[in-house]
From Swiss-Prot:
Domain of life where this protein originates: Bacteria
Function as written in the Swiss-Prot or TrEMBL entry: Component of the dark-operative protochlorophyllide reductase (DPOR) that uses Mg-ATP and reduced ferredoxin to reduce ring D of protochlorophyllide (Pchlide) to form chlorophyllide a (Chlide). This reaction is light-independent. The NB-protein (ChlN-ChlB) is the catalytic component of the complex.
Gene designation: chlB
Residues annotated for substrate binding in this entry: 425-426
Pathway(s) it belongs to: Porphyrin-containing compound metabolism; chlorophyll biosynthesis (light-independent)
Cofactor (UniProt): [4Fe-4S] cluster
Protein name (Swiss-Prot/TrEMBL): Light-independent protochlorophyllide reductase subunit B
Cofactor binding description: Binds 1 [4Fe-4S] cluster per heterodimer. The cluster is bound at the heterodimer interface by residues from both subunits.
GO biological process: light-independent chlorophyll biosynthetic process; photosynthesis, dark reaction
Binding-site list for [4Fe-4S] cluster: 36
EC class (word): oxidoreductase
C-alpha cells in the first residue's frame, strides 16, 4: 500500500460502479463503511449526470463491527430490491469491507431473490479500477448468457448474406467515466452505418439486461475499449463463436485498418484507402506547408493503454512527431505498450506514481505532452504545452458538445487538440521575443484607444537567478535565455548549466550560453 496525493485509478469497486451506472435496470449493493460513499461525486461532478449512480451502501460504522454485520448486508439488499426493483443485482464490497470477510455476494445469493445476482469478488489490494470494470462486465455477461451458450459452435459472421439483412455488430466497452465514450459511440455508429452495417447493442453504456441477452444475435463484436471489454469479447468468442475486432479506430490509419478488419470479418469488400482523406482534415494538413513547422516535435505520451498506443501511432505516422516518451498506468496493457515503445527505440514507462512520470517527462525534454489530468499539472509546472488524451480527467475534459476521439471526426478533434497548443505556444514565444520593441511596450497606444496598454501581456516565467551554491545566472544570461522558445528553454537551461559546471564557470552569462550552444551543436 502506498500513501499518495494522487492516483490514476480508484479501487476496483469504483470500476464496478461505473458498469452499474452505465447500464439501465442494474443495481449495485456495496458493503462499505461511511467514508467510501465519495464515489457518487465522480458521476455527478465529473460526468455532470443528473442522477446518482444506482448504488446502495451498507455504510457500516465502527460500532457495527461488534454486532452482526452480515445481517446488515442482508437488510440493505432486501431494501434495495424492494425500492429499486432491478432486473439484475450486483453485490460486492469495498476495499475496507474486504477486511471483514462478510462475503456479501454469498449472503445475497442465499436470500431467494428472483432476479440474477452477480457476486463480485474484486481484490482491492492487488487490482484497480479498470480491472474492476472489466471483471464486473465479464461476470455480468457470463451470468446472464451462460444458459444460452450452444452445445456446438456454428456461428457464421457472414450469415447475413443469405438471411437477406444488413450485417449487425455490437459495440462493447464504452462506459461512464471513460474518455469521450459517449461521443465515440455516436461517431462509430455513424461510420458503420455509412458502410451499411447496423449496430445491434451498445454495452455497457446505455444497455439493459434485455440488451445483454441479445448480444449473441450479432455477427461480430467490436471491442472499442480493450481495458473494459476484451475479456467479455473473448468469452463470447469461446462460448458462442462470435469473433471480435482488435483494432481501436483512433486516428486516420487505425480507422482505416478498423474498417478493413470489420469488412473482412463480415465478408464485405474493404473500403478505399482514400476515404480518410475525403472525410478528415488531418491528412490534408499533414501534407501542407504549414505542417513542416510541426515535423520532428518531441512528444511525451502517458495515459491508459488504449489511448497511449493510439497517440503514439498518430504522432509517429500521421503528424511526423518524434515520440520521446511512452507509458501507461494500466498494468493490464503493459505488454503492448512495451512492444510499441521498443519499436520506437525507447523504453516504456509502466507506473502509477505521478512523481515518477513527471521526472521522466522532465528528463525527456519534450515540446508537447499528451497525458491525463495529472500530466497537465506536471506539464504546467515544467512550462510545457499539454493536451489531455486519457482518463483520469477533469470536468473540462467532458465537454457538452460532441467531441469524439474515434473515427474520421475523432481525427479532426485530435488534430485540433494536439496542434493548437504547439501553435499557440509559438505565438506566445513571438510575443515574448518582441516584447521590448516599441510596438509591444506597455503604454504604447493603439487604434483602439488612448489609455495605453493594459499590461495583460506579461512574462509568465519566473527567472531563477541562483540555481545552486556554485552557479549563478546573470541578468544578461537570463535575458538571452528568454529569447529561446519556451518549449526547448528547459533543455537549453540544463545543457548550459552542465556545460558551465564542466568548464568551471561560476556565472552564466550570454557568452556562456553561446559557448554551450556551440559545444552541444558540434
Amino acid at each position: 500500500m502506498q500513501l499518495t496525493l494522487w492516483t490514476y485509478e480508484g479501487p476496483p469497486h469504483v470500476g464496478a460502479m461505473r458498469i452499474a451506472a452505465s447500464m439501465k435496470g442494474v443495481h449495485y449493493v456495496l458493503h462499505a463503511p461511511q467514508g467510501d460513499t465519495y464515489a457518487d461525486l465522480l458521476f455527478t461532478m465529473i460526468e455532470r449526470r443528473d442522477q446518482r449512480p444506482p448504488v446502495t451502501y451498507t455504510t457500516f460504522q465502527a460500532r457495527d463491527l461488534g454486532g452482526d454485520t452480515a445481517e446488515l448486508v442482508k437488510r440493505h439488499v432486501r431494501e434495495a430490491v424492494d425500492r429499486f426493483q432491478p432486473d439484475a443485482l450486483l453485490v460486492g464490497e469495498s476495499c475496507t469491507a474486504e477486511l471483514i470477510q462478510d462475503q456479501p455476494g454469498a449472503l445475497a445469493a442465499g436470500m431467494g431473490l428472483t432476479m440474477p445476482i452477480v457476486n463480485l469478488e474484486l481484490p482491492a489490494y492487488s487490482k484497480k479500477e479498470n480491472w474492476g470494470a472489466a471483471e464486473t462486465f465479464y461476470q455480468l455477461v457470463r451470468t446472464l448468457l451462460k444458459d444460452q451458450a450452444p452445445a456446438e459452435l456454428n456461428h457464421d459472421p457472414k450469415a447475413w448474406q443469405h438471411e437477406g439483412r444488413r450485417p449487425r455488430v455490437n459495440l462493447l466497452g464504452p462506459s461512464l467515466l471513460g474518455f469521450r465514450c459517449r461521443d465515440d459511440v455516436l461517431e462509430i455508429q455513424r461510420l458503420l452505418n455509412m458502410h451499411g452495417i447496423d449496430v445491434g447493442v451498445v454495452a455497457p453504456l446505455g444497455a439493459t439486461v434485455a440488451d445483454v441477452h441479445r448480444l449473441p444475435e450479432a455477427d461480430l463484436n467490436v471491442c472499442l475499449y480493450p481495458e473494459i471489454a476484451e475479456s467479455s469479447c473473448a468469452w463470447l468468442e469461446r462460448s458462442f463463436g462470435i469473433p471480435f475486432t482488435t483494432t481501436v479506430p483512433i486516428g486516420i490509419g487505425a480507422t482505416h485498418d478498423f474498417l478493413v478488419e470489420v469488412h473482412n470479418l463480415l465478408g464485405m469488400t474493404p473500403p478505399s484507402p482514400q476515404e480518410g482523406i475525403r472525410q478528415s482534415r488531418l491528412p490534408w494538413y499533414s501534407e501542407s506547408v504549414d505542417s513542416t513547422y510541426l515535423t520532428g516535435k518531441r512528444v511525451f505520451i502517458f495515459g491508459d493503454g488504449t489511448h497511449a498506443l493510439a497517440a503514439a501511432r498518430i504522432c509517429k505516422e500521421e503528424l511526423g512527431f518524434e515520440v520521446v516518451g511512452l507509458g501507461t498506468y494500466s498494468r493490464e496493457m503493459a505488454r503492448p505498450v512495451r512492444a510499441a515503445a521498443k519499436a520506437m527505440g525507447i523504453e516504456a514507462l509502466i507506473s502509477d506514481d505521478y512523481l515518477a512520470v513527471e521526472a521522466a517527462m522532465a528528463a525527456a525534454a519534450p515540446e508537447l505532452v499528451l497525458g491525463t489530468q495529472m500530466e497537465r499539472h506536471s506539464a504546467k509546472r515544467l512550462g510545457l504545452p499539454c493536451a489531455v488524451i486519457s482518463t483520469p480527467m477533469h470536468v473540462q475534459d467532458v465537454p457538452a458538445r460532441n467531441s469524439p476521439q474515434m473515427g474520421w471526426e475523432g481525427a479532426n478533434v485530435i488534430f485540433d487538440s494536439w496542434v493548437h497548443p504547439l501553435m499557440m505556444g509559438l505565438e506566445e514565444h513571438l510575443i515574448g521575443m518582441f516584447r521590448h520593441d516599441f510596438e509591444f511596450v506597455d503604454g504604447h497606444q493603439s487604434h483602439l484607444g488612448h489609455s495605453g496598454g493594459s499590461g495583460a501581456i506579461a512574462d509568465t516565467e519566473v527567472a531563477v537567478s541562483t540555481l545552486t551554491d556554485e552557479l549563478v545566472w546573470t541578468a544578461e544570461g537570463e535575458a538571452e535565455l528568454k529569447k529561446i522558445p519556451f518549449f526547448v528553454r528547459g533543455k537549453v537551461r540544463r545543457n548550459t548549466e552542465a556545460f558551465a559546471k564542466s568548464t568551471g564557470r561560476n556565472q552564466i552569462d550570454s557568452e556562456t550560453l553561446y559557448d554551450a550552444k556551440a559545444h552541444f551543436s558540434a
